[in-house]
Amino acid sequence: MKTVQDYIRTIVDFPHEGIMFRDVTTLFADPRGFRIAIDQMLHPYAGLQIDKVVGLEARGFILGGAIAHQLSKGFVPIRKKGKLPGKTISEAYTLEYGEAIVEIHDDAIQPGEKVLVVDDLLATGGTAEAGIKLIERLGGEIISTSFIIDLPDLGGRARLEAMGVEVNALCAYEGL
């Protein structure tokens, strides 16, 4: 039987020389691979109360939507600044060369709601940390984070765990 990693394509020297880009679009395109990934991402949360699933832009929308559907729960997107209509709150985070800002609708999470945060890849953890801060500012409680891929050498897992947040990933790749 194939594993999730069997469906992930590696592209050498993309987007820069020396980078091994882990492309999950091949996983999404395969119905069996996609089903395996969603089922495995759901497994740790069987029996837990989850009120909302939050997906981080952009591939977190694909995963989060599928997971929310399976759980019969609402889905909430966290988007780049300026992409959500209506009233939002924002959180800045640092990139390698500069800063980025993500936003969430100010009424998307109600105080006390239990939230699962989903994305395809955990690298430095900056986007996930910013998203978690937004959810917590709205009064949400982070149940866990779930990723397809963890790049442990980039420190994202340690960063989120230092915040007291549980991290689950289906697979890990060493290096960049």
Swiss-Prot record:
Family: Belongs to the purine/pyrimidine phosphoribosyltransferase family.
Gene name for this UniProt entry: apt
Keyword Mitochondrion included in the entry's annotation: no
PROSITE patterns, alphabetized: PUR_PYR_PR_TRANSFER (PS00103)
Keywords, alphabetical: Cytoplasm, Glycosyltransferase, Purine salvage, Transferase
Name of the protein: Adenine phosphoribosyltransferase
Pathway annotation from the record: Purine metabolism; AMP biosynthesis via salvage pathway; AMP from adenine: step 1/1
GO cellular component, one term: cytoplasm
Chief place where the protein resides: cytoplasm
Organism: Roseobacter denitrificans (strain ATCC 33942 / OCh 114) (Erythrobacter sp. (strain OCh 114))
